[in-house]
Design a protein with these regions (language model features):
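Conserved N-terminal entry element of GNAT/NAT acetyltransferase domains
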Residues: 1-13
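Conserved active-site alpha-helix within GNAT-family acetyltransferase domains
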Residues: 116-134
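Conserved GNAT-fold acetyl-CoA-binding loop/helix
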Residues: 11-24
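Conserved hydrophobic beta-strand within the GNAT/NAT acetyltransferase core sheet
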Residues: 110-114
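Residue-level recognition of the GNAT/N-acetyltransferase active site
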Residues: 82, 115
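Conserved catalytic-core motifs of GNAT/GCN5-like acyltransferases
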Residues: 131-145
Length: 165
């Protein structure tokens, strides 16, 4: 088991420089300006795994749409674990931290989307306690994208998607 520490980063975090080292200010500052948070795993005072959380719309280039969480939801996106540290349960542990924090903030649901062929991420999401409630089908024919959402499982509202700006 890896000796790691999990932290929550926002604009006022003393450890803010750690995420700048990983992704750079050009990407991070607009996220913090929107009030987003970063959940991260540290090993030897360096970020080795992270995921971002947003309460507002976030563009998803892969599907040419944006996820729009409801006012009582958060959306987790842009996850990454450095290859050397994969397989150490860092991803599920930061996902659990995000879920715990969402509960403290009285959010009803935390959304995360994983490509069906990403077995490792699907396993991590499951380990963290997420439940698959809906499937998004995406196809592209020539230059024409097509998306379809399955009906959500019982007692769940559908996820919301909007056009990219």
């Amino acid at each position: 088991r890896t000796n790691s520490t999990n932290i929550i980063l926002d604009r006022n975090s003393p450890e803010i420089e750690l995420i700048y080292e990983v992704q750079g200010k050009r990407i991070i500052d607009p996220r913090f300006d929107r009030g987003e948070k970063c959940y991260a795993a540290l090993v030897n005072e360096s970020i080795v795994s992270y995921i971002w959380s947003s309460r507002g719309s976030v563009g998803v280039d892969e599907i040419n749409m944006a996820v729009k969480p409801s006012t009582d939801e958060a959306y987790l996106y842009d996850a990454f674990t450095i290859e050397k540290w994969r397989g150490n349960n860092l991803y599920p542990s930061i996902l659990q931290l995000a879920l715990e924090n969402a509960e403290k903030e009285n959010l009803k649901r935390t959304l995360i989307f994983v490509e069906s062929n990403n077995t490792a991420s699907r396993r991590g999401v499951s380990k963290a306690g997420f439940e698959q409630f809906q499937t998004l089908y995406y196809k592209r024919f020539l230059f024409f994208p097509s998306t379809k959402l399955s009906t959500p499982i019982k007692n769940h509202n559908s996820a919301k998607f909007i056009a990219l700006k």
